[in-house]
Amino acid sequence: MSQDLIETTATTTKIVEARELGHQIHDSLLEQLKLQQEELLQQQRDLFFQEQQLQLQQQVTQPVSNNGNTWSFTQGLVIGQVSVIFIIIVFVKFFVFADSSSHIPTKPGLDGATGVIVKRNKNKKHSNGQFANDGENEDDTSLDSNQSKISSILEKTYYDVNNHASESLDWFNVLVAQTISQLRSEALLKDNIYHSLNNFLTNAKLPDFIDTINLTEIDIGDDFPIFSNCRIKYGEDLKRLEAKIDVDLSDTLTLGIATKLLLNQPRPLTAVLPVSLTVSIVRFSGCLTVSLINTKDIDLKNVDKTSNMNGYSKENANGDGASSSNNDEDEDDGGTALMFSFSPDYRLEFIVKSLIGSRAKLQDVPKISSLIENQLRTWFIERCVEPRFQVVRLPSLWPRTKNTREPVTKKTTTTPSTTVNGTSAATITTPGEYVNSNI
C-alpha cells in the first residue's frame, strides 16, 4: 500500500510540475507577443509620423503648382472657346450663306457642266509655239490614259489577261437558248418571219428577166448556238479590252424560194424558165470578238471613212445611203455601242438545192450552188469578218418608270350570283400576272 501511495504522489507531483511548466511557457509566450505588439505599434507610429511629415511638405509645395495648373486650365478653356466660336463663324459664312457672285446668271450647257465634272491634269499648259506637236501629244496622252484605265480595271477585278483561265459560259448559253426559243415560238404563232421576208421580196426591185419571188420553205431550226472558251484579251490598238468567244452552231436553217426566168426577146414573155432554190446553213463555227466602244471613237470614224472611200460599202449603190448617213449622225451623238466581228478562220457550211426547168428539169446544178455559196460568203465577209465589224448601239440602262413592272398575285373575284334555269352561277375573274406601275 505504501508503495502505491508513493507512486501516486510521484505522478501527482509530475503532473503539478508539468502544469507549472505549461504556465511558465504560456507566460513567456504572452510576454513575447506583447513585445512584438509594442514593436509593431512603434513602427506604425513612426510610419504615421513620416506620412504626416510628407503631407506637410506636399501642402507647402502645392500652392505653387496649383497656381500653374489653374492658369493652364484657364488658358485651355479660353483657347477652346475662341476656336469653337471661330469654327462656327466660318461655317455660317461659307456654308450657310451663299456667295453673292454665285447669283450672277450664267449660260447653261457646258459652262454649268464644267463646275460639276471633275477634270484631271488641270495644270498642263501649252505655249503658242507648241501647236504643231499638240496632236501627237494628245494622242500619246489619250493612249496612256486608256492603258492606265485598262490596267486599273484589270487590277480591281483581279483578272490576269495572260494567265486567267478561259470560261465556259454555260449560264450565257442558257439565256441565249431561252431568248431564241421565245423568238421561235413567236415566229411560229405570228408568222412574222414569213410576212417580213415576203414583204421584202415583194417590194424589192428586180430585173426585168426575173418574175415575182415566192417563199416555198422556211426552217428556223431547233438547236441553239454554244458559246465557250471565253477569254479577255487586249485589242490590237491597246485602247480597249476584247472578249474572244468560240461559237459553234450545228443546226439547219433553210430558206426556199421559187421564181421564173423570163425571156423577153424578141418579144415579151417569149420563154419562161421555172427556178426553185433552197439554201440551208448546216454548220457554223468561229471565234467571236466582242468589245464595248464609244461611238465618238476617232478610230471608228477613220475606219468608216476608209471603207467608204475604198468602196467597201456597197449598200449605197443599193439605195441604203440615206440610212447609213442617218446612222453616222446617230453615232456622232455619242454613247456606248457593242462592236463584234468574227475571225477569218471561221467555218460556214451550206447545202444548196436547185431545180431548173418545167418538163426536163435540172437538179442540183453545181455551178449554181457554188455561185450562191460564194455570194453568201462575200456578203458575210464584207460585214462581219475582221478587219470589218458590226456596231450595235446599246440602249440607255437608266431605270425608267415606264419600264417598271411588278408581279401581281392571282386573286379570284366573284360577281353577284345569277340564277339560270333555277341554278345559281357566279362569274370568276383573274387579273393578269404583271401590271405596269406607271400611273
Swiss-Prot record:
Domain SMP-LTD: 165-395
Location relative to the cell: Endoplasmic reticulum membrane
CDD domains: SMP_Mmm1
Keyword Endoplasmic reticulum carried by entry: yes
HAMAP family to which the protein is assigned, alphabetical: Mmm1 (MF_03103)
Side of membrane Lumenal, spans: 1-76
Name the record gives this protein: Maintenance of mitochondrial morphology protein 1
Family, as annotated: Belongs to the MMM1 family.
Residues on Cytoplasmic side: 98-439
Function: Component of the ERMES/MDM complex, which serves as a molecular tether to connect the endoplasmic reticulum (ER) and mitochondria. Components of this complex are involved in the control of mitochondrial shape and protein biogenesis, and function in nonvesicular lipid trafficking between the ER and mitochondria. The MDM12-MMM1 subcomplex functions in the major beta-barrel assembly pathway that is responsible for biogenesis of all outer membrane beta-barrel proteins, and acts in a late step after the SAM complex.
Highest taxon above the source species: Eukaryota
One example of a Gene Ontology biological process annotation: protein insertion into mitochondrial outer membrane
A cellular-component GO term for this protein: ERMES complex
Domain comment in the entry: The SMP-LTD domain is a barrel-like domain that can bind various types of glycerophospholipids in its interior and mediate their transfer between two adjacent bilayers.
KW Endoplasmic reticulum (keyword) present: yes
The species this protein was found in: Candida albicans (strain SC5314 / ATCC MYA-2876) (Yeast)
Pfam families the UniProt entry points to: MMM1
Record field: transmembrane: 77-97
Comp. bias intervals (Low complexity): 315-326, 410-424
